[in-house]
């Protein structure tokens, strides 16, 4: 089976490298060509354009937002125009529910397969093959690519036959993680203002009721006040909150916390923090409490 991979940012590069390490026949493409070389060194073939990647049987994409995905997939020289009938596009990007539905319909009209498979996990998990795959699409297509998911992740969750529902689940999960980050920041600011060491407080939390990776990883970043390099940049968190709110409006679901989080990301960006890790919103409560400048 020939594979293609488009989008070699920190997440995509780690995922593509996993396929190289598993000795798959892989062709890669990225708009910034300098990102190709590390994968070529690992055994991948570099493509000059999207059409060359689309000679593959399965093409993965890992792109940053709706605009990038629309350009790469629906553009005149994109995946839709070049993927052969029967081949499969697996989109691992975190995009809007509405765009995922459009992609599904567009691929269907061309007799091309489409699976939405956004992931939970940061770049270190991608490089280690420890992602959680959130997949939705036709059962026969998912069965065909499941061995590939096993290369990328420690577990695959199949949520629906409708691809866009995987994106709804992913966005809902990111909303929940952002809620945890903000809550951790607020709680740490409260105890610190009251004279309790924030690292000691975090150790108490993660050694008792909150011994889970989200609290441990992001809690440490907030307590250390160290948000670089960004595993997931704050401007992408802001983008995701907009997508969450758009999905909520479409489904007539009130999400007051999502509106607050959107404002927090906007506040962080206004103070020059859009490229910090998204956990930097957890520092805003300390700033509001005059604990840090």
Regions found by a protein language model. Name each.
Residues 15-16, 103, 148, 190:
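Hydrophobic residues within alpha-helices
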Residues 1-62, 87, 123, 155:
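NAD(P)+-binding Rossmann beta1-loop-alpha1 motif at the extreme N-terminus of oxidoreductases
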Residues 26, 46, 114-115, 156, ...:
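Hydrophobic beta-strand scaffold residues
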Residues 163-288:
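Helical "substrate-binding/catalytic lid" subdomain
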Residues 94-175:
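Rossmann-fold dinucleotide-binding core
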Residues 50-113:
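Rossmann-fold NAD(P) dinucleotide-binding segment
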């Amino acid at each position: 089976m020939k594979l293609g991979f488009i989008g070699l940012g920190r997440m995509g590069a780690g995922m593509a490298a996993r396929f190289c390490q598993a000795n798959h026949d892989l062709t890669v493409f990225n708009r910034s060509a300098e990102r190709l070389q590390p994968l070529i060194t690992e055994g991948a073939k570099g493509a000059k354009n999207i059409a060359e990647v689309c000679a593959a049987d399965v093409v993965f994409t890992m792109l940053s937002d709706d605009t990038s995905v629309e350009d790469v997939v629906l553009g005149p020289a994109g995946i839709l125009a070049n993927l052969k009938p029967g081949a499969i596009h697996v989109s691992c990007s975190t995009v809007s529910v509405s765009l995922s539905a459009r992609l599904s319909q567009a691929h269907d009209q061309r007799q091309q397969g489409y699976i939405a498979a956004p992931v939970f996990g940061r770049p270190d998990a991608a490089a280690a093959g420890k992602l959680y795959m959130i997949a939705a699409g036709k059962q026969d297509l998912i069965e065909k690519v499941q061995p590939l998911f096993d290369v990328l992740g420690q577990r695959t969750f199949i949520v629906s036959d409708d691809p866009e529902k995987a994106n709804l689940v992913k966005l809902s999960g990111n909303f929940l993680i952002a809620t945890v980050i903000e809550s951790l920041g607020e709680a740490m600011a409260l105890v610190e203002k009251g004279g309790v060491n924030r690292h000691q407080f975090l150790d108490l939390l993660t050694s008792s009721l909150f011994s889970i990776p989200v609290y441990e990883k992001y809690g440490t970043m907030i307590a250390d006040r160290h948000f670089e390099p960004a595993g997931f940049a704050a401007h992408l968190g802001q983008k995701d909150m907009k997508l969450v709110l758009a999905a909520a409006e479409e489904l007539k679901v009130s999400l007051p916390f999502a509106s607050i989080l959107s404002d927090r990301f906007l506040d962080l960006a206004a103070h020059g923090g859009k490229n910090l890790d998204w956990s930097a919103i957890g520092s805003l409560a300390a700033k509001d409490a005059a604990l840090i400048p």
